[in-house]
Amino acid sequence: MRDQKSLVADPRMLTLARDSRGWTQSELADEMTRLDGSRITQGYVSRAEAGRIPVREGRVQLFADALRYTADTLCRATDTAGAGVGLVHHRKRASLGAPALRRIHATLALTRLQVDSLARAADLHRNDRFRRVEVNDFDTPADAAETMREEWKVPAGPIEDMVALLEDAGALVVVRDLCTTELDAVSQWPPGGHPLILLNSHAPADRSRFSLAHELGHLVMHGEPGEGRVQEDQANRFAAEFLMPHDAVLPELKPGIDVSRLLDLKARWGVSMAALIRRAMDLGVISEWHYRTLMVELSALGYRTAEPTTIRRETPRHLAQAVTRLEQQLHLSPTETAHLAGLGREEFHEIYLCASSPSGHKDVPDSSAR
């Protein structure tokens, strides 16, 4: 940790931190006023974020206390820290507004800084099995999915654990509250780095698996910006083939599908009933009319909102293992580990241990906790 006298906030990091909290400049100014006792204006926050006035020493700490990040985090240079670098992919609904999307992008950027700091400190080994796969008029998204399954030696049939598969290939997966139900996952693979996927903790388990496969499709197929709808369709087709390979799922769909049969297939393949119906249509097992009829039936039963048959929720392991190493082998306190990620202890625990803690990880007394 740097001496407070050397602290100078990076203007872009101030904006990124505020966006990640979903606050306006006025809301941040109000919180700083509440904490400090003296009036902080929206204009002051605006000038600080624009770099027109330097934010030093005690004022850095005030911003940090209000935004609930460490002061060191706000002083990181965004052009060297990796924040905001790389193409961002997300599986979202059209109704997701710009402020919510800005918050998610900021959360992704700051999460990358956090996980990179933890992985580096723990000397976390990560495989490097991701690569770009070209998709064109001859090589389809389904071909790309088949290629990745072959290269990663995925056994035939349903995938047992998508999170484990992605982590073993070199990605880091973080399950956290993205403060919306309009987006299930977001991902990024910056140059020279490893893929990172944020999975919305609000997403149902069956939808989460498809979202992870969807993000994998983006990561391997879409290294450059493209037409949004085209890339979304390609990622969906990749995900369908990756999770439900045509040669394995087709014989199970061909006898015909109804709601009862869909429940059985959902439990076996670990995808939603809606995804199975779409797969059946795309493979020519049912007509578009039959597809629409089944979707109307799901709606009438209330299954478009919440489907029956619970699927096991898959949990990340690699970052929790890194935290265990930092605390048990390198003897860092929980607060010191949290500060490595630029967070307070409670928020760090909620993000990196509650949703992804392997059994056996326990909190230990921390005399340094504030």
Give the location of each predicted region.
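Active-site hotspot residues in diverse enzymes, especially metal/ion-binding acidic/histidine motifs
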Residues: 1-370
